[in-house]
Protein backbone atom coordinates (compact mmCIF):
# COMPACT_ATOMS: atom_id res chain seq x y z
CA UNK A 1 0.00 0.00 0.00
CA UNK A 2 1.58 3.24 -1.14
CA UNK A 3 0.96 6.84 -0.14
CA UNK A 4 -1.66 9.14 -1.56
CA UNK A 5 -1.31 12.84 -2.29
CA UNK A 6 -3.10 16.07 -1.40
CA UNK A 7 -4.58 18.20 -4.18
CA UNK A 8 -6.69 21.34 -4.50
CA UNK A 9 -10.00 21.35 -6.34
CA UNK A 10 -10.00 23.77 -9.28
CA UNK A 11 -13.46 23.23 -10.75
CA UNK A 12 -15.39 21.23 -13.34
CA UNK A 13 -15.43 21.08 -17.11
CA UNK A 14 -16.34 18.55 -19.78
CA UNK A 15 -14.85 17.06 -22.94
CA UNK A 16 -16.00 14.74 -25.69
CA UNK A 17 -14.34 11.34 -25.98
CA UNK A 18 -13.55 9.47 -29.19
CA UNK A 19 -17.11 8.12 -29.34
CA UNK A 20 -18.61 11.61 -29.21
CA UNK A 21 -19.89 11.12 -25.67
CA UNK A 22 -19.68 14.06 -23.27
CA UNK A 23 -17.54 13.27 -20.24
CA UNK A 24 -17.80 15.48 -17.11
CA UNK A 25 -14.42 16.14 -15.51
CA UNK A 26 -13.21 17.57 -12.21
CA UNK A 27 -9.84 19.32 -12.33
CA UNK A 28 -7.57 19.14 -9.29
CA UNK A 29 -4.16 20.78 -8.93
CA UNK A 30 -1.10 19.35 -7.19
CA UNK A 31 1.11 22.22 -6.02
CA UNK A 32 4.33 21.88 -3.98
CA UNK A 33 3.32 18.51 -2.52
CA UNK A 34 6.16 17.17 -0.35
CA UNK A 35 6.89 14.55 2.30
CA UNK A 36 7.12 16.34 5.66
CA UNK A 37 7.56 13.44 8.07
CA UNK A 38 7.55 9.70 8.78
CA UNK A 39 5.49 7.65 11.23
CA UNK A 40 7.09 4.26 11.97
CA UNK A 41 5.54 1.22 13.61
CA UNK A 42 8.27 0.86 16.26
CA UNK A 43 7.62 4.37 17.59
CA UNK A 44 4.06 5.29 16.62
CA UNK A 45 2.40 1.89 16.19
CA UNK A 46 1.83 2.24 12.44
CA UNK A 47 3.63 3.19 9.23
CA UNK A 48 2.61 6.43 7.52
CA UNK A 49 3.88 9.42 5.60
CA UNK A 50 3.01 13.00 6.52
CA UNK A 51 2.33 14.88 3.29
CA UNK A 52 2.09 18.67 2.94
CA UNK A 53 0.89 20.88 0.11
CA UNK A 54 1.13 24.53 -0.91
CA UNK A 55 3.76 26.81 0.60
CA UNK A 56 2.71 29.07 3.46
CA UNK A 57 4.13 32.31 4.88
CA UNK A 58 6.50 31.60 7.76
CA UNK A 59 4.84 34.40 9.76
CA UNK A 60 1.58 32.42 9.81
CA UNK A 61 3.12 29.24 11.24
CA UNK A 62 3.14 28.41 14.96
CA UNK A 63 6.47 27.90 16.72
CA UNK A 64 6.06 24.12 17.19
CA UNK A 65 5.24 23.66 13.49
CA UNK A 66 8.17 25.87 12.48
CA UNK A 67 10.46 23.33 14.12
CA UNK A 68 8.70 20.45 12.35
CA UNK A 69 9.25 22.04 8.95
CA UNK A 70 12.82 23.02 9.86
CA UNK A 71 13.66 19.43 10.82
CA UNK A 72 12.21 18.21 7.51
CA UNK A 73 14.07 20.95 5.61
CA UNK A 74 10.94 21.92 3.68
CA UNK A 75 9.09 25.20 3.39
CA UNK A 76 5.98 25.56 5.62
CA UNK A 77 2.87 23.97 4.16
CA UNK A 78 -0.76 25.05 4.26
CA UNK A 79 -2.29 21.56 4.57
CA UNK A 80 -0.89 18.41 6.18
CA UNK A 81 -2.28 14.87 6.08
CA UNK A 82 -1.11 11.39 7.04
CA UNK A 83 -1.33 8.46 4.65
CA UNK A 84 -0.93 4.90 5.94
CA UNK A 85 1.58 2.89 3.92
CA UNK A 86 3.22 -0.53 3.94
CA UNK A 87 6.74 -0.88 5.27
CA UNK A 88 8.32 -1.07 1.81
CA UNK A 89 6.74 2.17 0.52
CA UNK A 90 8.54 4.84 2.52
CA UNK A 91 9.68 7.93 0.61
CA UNK A 92 12.51 10.22 1.71
CA UNK A 93 11.56 13.31 3.70
CA UNK A 94 11.47 16.48 1.53
CA UNK A 95 10.84 14.40 -1.60
CA UNK A 96 8.31 15.95 -4.00
CA UNK A 97 5.18 14.20 -5.21
CA UNK A 98 3.91 15.19 -8.65
CA UNK A 99 0.85 14.34 -10.71
CA UNK A 100 2.75 11.46 -12.33
CA UNK A 101 2.35 9.63 -9.01
CA UNK A 102 -0.82 8.40 -10.75
CA UNK A 103 -1.47 7.35 -14.35
CA UNK A 104 -4.29 8.02 -16.81
CA UNK A 105 -6.89 5.27 -16.67
CA UNK A 106 -6.17 4.46 -13.04
CA UNK A 107 -8.96 4.14 -10.49
CA UNK A 108 -8.69 6.23 -7.33
CA UNK A 109 -10.51 7.00 -4.09
CA UNK A 110 -11.07 10.69 -3.31
CA UNK A 111 -11.68 11.96 0.23
CA UNK A 112 -13.02 15.49 0.73
CA UNK A 113 -15.29 17.63 2.91
CA UNK A 114 -18.76 18.29 1.53
CA UNK A 115 -20.12 21.80 1.12
CA UNK A 116 -21.90 23.01 4.27
CA UNK A 117 -25.64 23.70 3.93
CA UNK A 118 -26.33 24.88 7.48
CA UNK A 119 -29.45 23.80 9.37
CA UNK A 120 -31.66 21.85 6.96
CA UNK A 121 -35.07 20.25 7.28
CA UNK A 122 -35.79 16.55 6.90
CA UNK A 123 -37.01 16.87 3.30
CA UNK A 124 -33.78 18.47 2.11
CA UNK A 125 -31.44 16.59 4.44
CA UNK A 126 -32.90 13.07 4.18
CA UNK A 127 -35.18 13.27 1.11
CA UNK A 128 -38.37 12.75 3.15
CA UNK A 129 -41.62 13.12 1.20
CA UNK A 130 -43.19 15.41 3.80
CA UNK A 131 -46.84 15.36 4.86
CA UNK A 132 -49.95 15.90 2.75
CA UNK A 133 -50.61 19.25 1.07
CA UNK A 134 -54.22 19.31 2.32
CA UNK A 135 -56.76 16.89 3.90
CA UNK A 136 -56.47 18.35 7.36
CA UNK A 137 -52.72 19.00 7.51
CA UNK A 138 -52.01 22.43 8.98
CA UNK A 139 -48.58 24.12 8.99
CA UNK A 140 -46.80 20.75 9.00
CA UNK A 141 -46.40 20.12 5.29
CA UNK A 142 -42.59 19.80 5.43
CA UNK A 143 -42.48 18.12 8.84
CA UNK A 144 -40.72 14.79 9.43
CA UNK A 145 -43.73 13.34 11.25
CA UNK A 146 -43.50 11.04 14.26
CA UNK A 147 -40.11 10.54 15.94
CA UNK A 148 -40.94 7.69 18.34
CA UNK A 149 -43.50 5.18 19.63
CA UNK A 150 -45.27 5.51 23.02
CA UNK A 151 -44.51 5.43 26.76
CA UNK A 152 -42.33 2.42 26.03
CA UNK A 153 -39.53 3.06 25.00
CA UNK A 154 -40.36 6.68 25.88
CA UNK A 155 -37.44 8.18 24.01
CA UNK A 156 -36.14 9.04 20.55
CA UNK A 157 -33.58 6.49 19.39
CA UNK A 158 -30.09 7.68 18.54
CA UNK A 159 -29.54 8.07 14.81
CA UNK A 160 -33.16 8.98 14.09
CA UNK A 161 -33.29 10.98 10.86
CA UNK A 162 -34.39 14.49 11.75
CA UNK A 163 -33.69 18.09 10.84
CA UNK A 164 -30.18 19.28 11.66
CA UNK A 165 -26.85 20.49 10.37
CA UNK A 166 -26.23 19.35 6.78
CA UNK A 167 -22.89 19.11 5.03
CA UNK A 168 -19.36 19.83 6.30
CA UNK A 169 -18.75 16.09 6.65
CA UNK A 170 -15.84 14.05 5.36
CA UNK A 171 -16.81 11.57 2.66
CA UNK A 172 -14.91 9.26 0.34
CA UNK A 173 -15.94 8.66 -3.28
CA UNK A 174 -14.58 5.33 -4.47
CA UNK A 175 -13.51 4.03 -7.86
CA UNK A 176 -13.26 7.31 -9.76
CA UNK A 177 -11.26 7.08 -12.98
CA UNK A 178 -8.44 9.40 -13.99
CA UNK A 179 -9.24 10.67 -17.48
CA UNK A 180 -5.93 12.43 -18.18
CA UNK A 181 -2.94 14.07 -16.51
CA UNK A 182 -1.34 17.41 -17.43
CA UNK A 183 2.15 17.36 -15.94
CA UNK A 184 3.06 20.86 -17.17
CA UNK A 185 0.08 22.46 -15.42
CA UNK A 186 0.13 20.04 -12.49
CA UNK A 187 -3.47 19.00 -13.14
CA UNK A 188 -5.29 15.69 -12.70
CA UNK A 189 -8.55 15.30 -14.64
CA UNK A 190 -10.98 13.01 -12.82
CA UNK A 191 -14.13 11.63 -14.41
CA UNK A 192 -17.25 12.68 -12.53
CA UNK A 193 -17.72 15.00 -9.57
CA UNK A 194 -16.08 15.09 -6.16
CA UNK A 195 -17.26 16.73 -2.91
CA UNK A 196 -16.20 20.17 -1.76
CA UNK A 197 -16.11 23.73 -3.04
CA UNK A 198 -13.58 25.26 -5.42
CA UNK A 199 -10.24 25.69 -3.71
CA UNK A 200 -10.86 23.01 -1.09
CA UNK A 201 -8.21 20.40 -0.34
CA UNK A 202 -8.79 16.75 -1.16
CA UNK A 203 -6.79 13.57 -0.71
CA UNK A 204 -6.31 11.07 -3.53
CA UNK A 205 -5.33 7.42 -3.00
CA UNK A 206 -5.16 4.26 -5.08
CA UNK A 207 -8.58 2.59 -5.21
CA UNK A 208 -8.74 -0.24 -2.67
CA UNK A 209 -11.51 -2.10 -4.52
CA UNK A 210 -9.98 -1.99 -8.00
CA UNK A 211 -6.92 -4.08 -8.80
CA UNK A 212 -6.48 -3.10 -12.45
CA UNK A 213 -5.35 0.46 -13.21
CA UNK A 214 -7.26 0.56 -16.50
CA UNK A 215 -10.92 0.18 -17.31
Swiss-Prot record:
Pfam families: Ribosomal_L3. Part of the 50S ribosomal subunit. Forms a cluster with proteins L14 and L19. Belongs to the universal ribosomal protein uL3 family. It comes from Rickettsia bellii (strain OSU 85-389). One of the primary rRNA binding proteins, it binds directly near the 3'-end of the 23S rRNA, where it nucleates assembly of the 50S subunit. GO terms for cellular component: ribonucleoprotein complex; ribosome. HAMAP family: Ribosomal_uL3_B. Keywords: Methylation, Ribonucleoprotein, Ribosomal protein, RNA-binding, rRNA-binding. It comes from the Bacteria. The modification N5-methylglutamine is found at residue 151. Transmembrane segments: none annotated. Coiled coil: none annotated. GO terms for molecular function: rRNA binding; structural constituent of ribosome. The keyword Ribosomal protein applies. PROSITE patterns: RIBOSOMAL_L3. The lineage of its organism: Bacteria, Pseudomonadati, Pseudomonadota, Alphaproteobacteria, Rickettsiales. GO terms for biological process: translation. The gene is rplC. Methylated by PrmB. This is Large ribosomal subunit protein uL3.
Amino acid sequence: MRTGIIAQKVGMTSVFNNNGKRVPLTLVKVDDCQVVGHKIAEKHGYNALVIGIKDKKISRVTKPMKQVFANAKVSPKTKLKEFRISEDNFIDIAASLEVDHFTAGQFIDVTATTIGKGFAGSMKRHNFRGLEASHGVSISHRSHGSTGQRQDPGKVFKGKKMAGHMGCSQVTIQNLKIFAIDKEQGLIMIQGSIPGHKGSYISIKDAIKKISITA
